[in-house]
Amino acid sequence: MKQTDGRERKAYLSLLYFAVILLPVFLLGCYLYNEKQLRVGQFQEFNTHNLQEHITPLQQSKEDKDKKTDLVPLEFCDVFTGKWVLDNVTHPLYKEDECEFLSEWVACTRNGRPDSKYQKWRWQPQDCSLPRFDSKLLLEKLRGKKLMFIGDSIHYNQWQSMVCMVQSVIPSGKKTLKHTAQMSIFNIEEYNATISFYWAPFLVESNADPPDKRDGKTDPVIIPNSISKHGENWKDADYLIFNTYIWWTRHSTIKVLKQESFNKGDSKEYNEIGIYIVYKQVLSTWTKWLEQNINPSQTSIFFSSMSPTHIRSSDWGFNEGSKCEKETEPILNMSKPINVGTNRRLYEIALNATKSTKVPIHFLNITTMSEYRKDGHTSFYGSINGKLMTPEQKLDPRTFADCYHWCLPGLPDSWNELLSLYIIYKI
């Protein structure tokens, strides 16, 4: 009987221990767990809400586009080898009459050019597909930055193209254009960005630098080792795109000033030296300046290869014209190289110069793709000193047809599409 009472007492004490001590602990644990879950849920909901709140439509669009471009192995693709494809859907990238900043000089349709097919050719690389040009995506990359074209009138041509390619997505009143003696600056207020052009046809100092000496009527005189005067204006840019070619093609020699500066009077003391020697010297001066003044972690450097001319129609087997004035189609047979007179020796000097520097320089090989575009020049539909060509001038294409510069919209837009690929995806 006592044994039974002892067992009952132990059972009673165990139950009492559970009720008094363990049960409250268990209930407290349940309460704390539920409270934690509630707080975690509230925290996760808060974070998700904030995340969605800060994703703008532009950012979502950019994400989607980045996912698509993952399929494009641009880093393995030679985007400069390909063919021209007629594309009425995506090209032209803008309309001539919708770009308020397009000058009469290259507005060929406005100036009476009757055909427009030259605006509708898209460059298709051989080994990859390219994402469609997205002006908003490019402007996002340029936000808070400065992009500068430096060189001759071909680069001014390309700068105008770039301005027209992006300006349509910028609200009215948020974009301005300013011209100075050496520069043209397109300011994009909404993005705190600028796209500018700096006139330096030889990169180094020359007598063709002043505004009243740019018509090509005066033989150029240069100082091959003097670049700092120009370079001071380049230092704070985030993207520098250089070119120098067309002024080198006039003669087999070029005049080199004996003095160190043009400021010491109008000296005629100069030496005439072969263009290849001086071109190499100028590019050496240029690359040394870049190495001493440009931080490659902050500034990206590009060099555009030679923009070809089409001044002999016999080069492409057409003997009824004299230059490019009757051309409305590209050369579509790209299975064999074409010789339209591009100075390949200058090309090789430039290519080698960009390869042998301490700072990386992206060589934009626009030459071959452009050699097939005999149809794209301003020809009779540009302007000379702000004046359209007269009927009498059009009877003399050998003298007056401009087969150097390019109509816009047109070929320079394709150059800028490829430049934009480097800026958006490769850098």
From Swiss-Prot:
Motif GDS motif positions after renumbering to this chain: 151-153
GO molecular function, one term: O-acetyltransferase activity
GO cellular component, one term: membrane
Membrane-crossing residue ranges in chain numbering: 12-32
UniProt entry tagged with the keyword Cytoplasm: no
Membrane topology: Single-pass type II membrane protein
Keywords: Membrane, Signal-anchor, Transmembrane, Transmembrane helix
Extent of motif DCXHWCLPGXXDXWN motif: 402-416
InterPro entries: TBL, TBL_C, TBL_N
Subcellular location: Membrane
Cleaved signal peptide residues: none
Superkingdom of origin: Eukaryota
Something else known: Contains 2 motifs that are conserved in esterases, but it is unlikely that this protein belongs to the catalytically active pectin esterases.
Record's function text: May act as a bridging protein that binds pectin and other cell wall polysaccharides. Probably involved in maintaining esterification of pectins. May be involved in the specific O-acetylation of cell wall polymers.
UniProt family annotation: Belongs to the PC-esterase family. TBL subfamily.
Identification of the protein by name: Protein trichome birefringence-like 30
Source organism per UniProt: Arabidopsis thaliana
